[in-house]
From Swiss-Prot:
Reaction catalyzed: RNA(n) + a ribonucleoside 5'-triphosphate = RNA(n+1) + diphosphate
Key words of the record: DNA-directed RNA polymerase, Nucleotidyltransferase, Transcription, Transferase
Assembly with partners or alone: The RNAP catalytic core consists of 2 alpha, 1 beta, 1 beta' and 1 omega subunit. When a sigma factor is associated with the core the holoenzyme is formed, which can initiate transcription.
Annotated protein name in UniProt: DNA-directed RNA polymerase subunit omega
Class of enzymatic activity (EC top level): transferase
EC number annotated for this UniProt entry: 2.7.7.6
Gene Ontology biological process terms in this record: DNA-templated transcription
Gene name per UniProt: rpoZ
Source organism, top-level taxon: Bacteria
The species this protein was found in: Acidiphilium cryptum (strain JF-5)
């Protein structure tokens, strides 16, 4: 068989999605060193896997078990590098600002409100609005 077509493989595995999964798993097994059941003919692993499926020279049950095992395996977590560690929130203030207690914040707010009179507030609002009436 010089060319592998999907029709050749569909006779063995009717579901195209299952065919793709099993062929990919067989190609991975071949790249890990599994024995080839047909002549390679200078073909790459995915083509060899499809040819093996079309010729029914591979155990489909074993392939399904390998596929389930590989899909159920959880990859090892990658260690977080230093830049990522800097972004993870900690007990320290992540913005590098000094922590201000509630009492200090209330005192600062009271000092600001005492310094501004109602005329100052009205002038600030008028300046913010551009001297005109607010739009509705």
């Amino acid at each position: 068989m010089a060319r592998v077509t999907v029709e050749d493989c569909i006779e063995q595995i009717p579901n195209r999605f299952e065919l793709v999964l099993l062929a990919a798993q067989r190609a991975r097994n071949l790249s890990r060193g599994a024995s080839i059941t047909i002549d390679r003919d200078n073909d790459k692993n995915p083509v060899v896997a499809l040819r093996e499926i079309a010729d029914s020279t591979v155990d489909f049950g074993g392939l399904e078990q390998d596929l389930v095992k590989s899909l159920s395996r959880v990859p090892d977590p990658e260690p977080a590098d230093e830049e990522v560690q800097d972004l993870i929130p900690t007990d320290q203030n992540i913005f590098g600002l000094q922590d201000v207690s509630a009492e200090e914040e209330a005192a600062a707010m009271a000092a600001e409100s005492e310094e501004m009179t109602s005329e100052d507030i009205a002038a600030a609002i008028e300046a913010e609005l551009g001297g005109g009436r607010p739009r509705r």
